[in-house]
Structures are given as C-alpha cells and as structure tokens.
C-alpha cells in the first residue's frame, strides 16, 4: 500500500471529499484509517466516478451491512456538499491481514496491495 504523499497528487477533489467524509464519521465511528481504491486510486476515473473508500475501524467487528448503510447516508450528505459520491467499504482492525476470511477476498487483497492510504 502507498500513502497519498507518495503519489503526484491524490487530486484535491479526492482529498477534500475524503476529509469531509472522515469528519462526519467521527461522531459515530472510531476510524483507524481510510484507503482510497478503485478508479480514482488508479487514476483512470471519469468525471462522474465515485470515490471508493475502505474505512478501517478500530474495535470489534460490527455488522457489515448495517455499517455500510449508515455510512452510505453520511456519504450522501458529503456528495451534496462536494459533488463527489463516496462509496464506503467498512473494514475492521485486522481485516486487511486476513482476506481469506471474506467471500470477496480478491477485493480485500486489491485494497491492501494497491490502495492509497489517506491522511
């Protein structure tokens, strides 16, 4: 995984949107880190592409669906402010180290290997 200071620019829109999203998450979640992945991380996104963010949370694993739906509501508020839609993907401490525990283990591996750690 690389960090956002190792790339020419994790464009201003992505940084601003991710920061706004993280600020809104603080009231409800203990965020360990956020990782940008997908087309915006690869740099092959279009103007209407969403911003895929893996949100790694501290603590005991919660319910994925409930957490994702709650985060999607927060993401909608951020989209109204920034014009960029965030697609949150909640993970918990240790999940990236054990992709084999997931039905979509290839996605977890991609996030761990190719994602851009923000902040």
Q: Where on the chain are the PLM-derived regions?
A:
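Short beta-strand->loop micro-motif that forms the acidic, two-metal-ion catalytic signature
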Residues: 51-56
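Catalytic core of pol beta-like nucleotidyltransferases
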Residues: 1-32, 42-47, 58-119
């Amino acid at each position: 995984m690389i960090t956002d200071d190792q790339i020419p620019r994790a464009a201003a829109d992505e940084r601003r949107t991710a920061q706004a999203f993280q600020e809104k998450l603080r009231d409800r979640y203990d965020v360990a880190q956020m990782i940008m992945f997908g087309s915006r991380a690869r740099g092959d996104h279009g103007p209407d592409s969403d911003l895929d963010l893996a949100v790694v949370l501290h603590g005991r694993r919660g319910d994925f669906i409930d957490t994702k739906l709650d985060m999607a509501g927060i993401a909608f508020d951020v989209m109204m402010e920034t014009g960029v839609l965030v697609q949150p993907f909640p993970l918990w401490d240790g999940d990236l180290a054990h992709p084999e525990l997931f039905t979509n283990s290839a996605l977890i591996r991609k996030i761990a290997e190719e994602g851009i750690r923000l902040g």
